[in-house]
Amino acid sequence: MIRPIVLVLLCALLIQLLLADPVCDDLYIHGKNKKRTVVKSLFSEEECSKIINEGGVYAKKHTWLKNRHGRYSTTDNEVTDTWSVWDMIKNKISKMMYPKIAKMYNINQSKLGIKEVFLVKYSENGQRKLEYHKDGCEFSFIVALNDHFQGGGTTFKHDQKNIQLRIGDTLLFSGRNEHKGNEIALGTRYILAGFLNYGGNHYCTIRTS
């Protein structure tokens, strides 16, 4: 006869096996999250200008927010479906970013979803940089919207490589890969940033906690 305590342990193990997902294990437990890629000219200069311009109009009316992401907040505003550029951005994500991420990480593209998209502003008279951090999502992207600044770029802690993007270029990576926004010296740097979930909100954190 199986003892009750053994039965409980077997049930717990079975639950863990049922909940297990190799993608989550790779990203959260095994640290296999160092892959990244840069997609050249995913956005046109005209599209980038439209995002910046609409962001400027929105900020004049609502101001720039500085505390939306806790300890590692940026000066930003969330881009939502009330923005005229939303459909264009959403289409770029679903039709161009999702396939790249799915191929890079060998995952099911249909499980990817948008958690948040936001316009970030770094300026010489405001927030100049963002310290090393991990994003609260499985996958992330950064789109360079302008080049009217000196410095900047994104550095990943594991290899210390500073990735500089041209206008319209998009950096795709795992949000679990620790990275930082490098300090700008002059001007204003605008980026479009996005957090992408895999399998739904908190899907992986539940399975790896």
Set out the residue ranges of the language-model regions.
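Compositionally biased, intrinsically disordered low-complexity segments
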Residues: I5-C11, L18, S41-L42, M88, ...
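Catalytic core of non-heme Fe(II) oxygenases with the double-stranded beta-helix
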Residues: P99-S209
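Non-heme Fe(II)/2-oxoglutarate
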Residues: P22-S110
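Fe(II)/2-oxoglutarate
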Residues: M1-V38, T205-S209
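Basic side chains
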Residues: R3, R68-R71, K121, R189
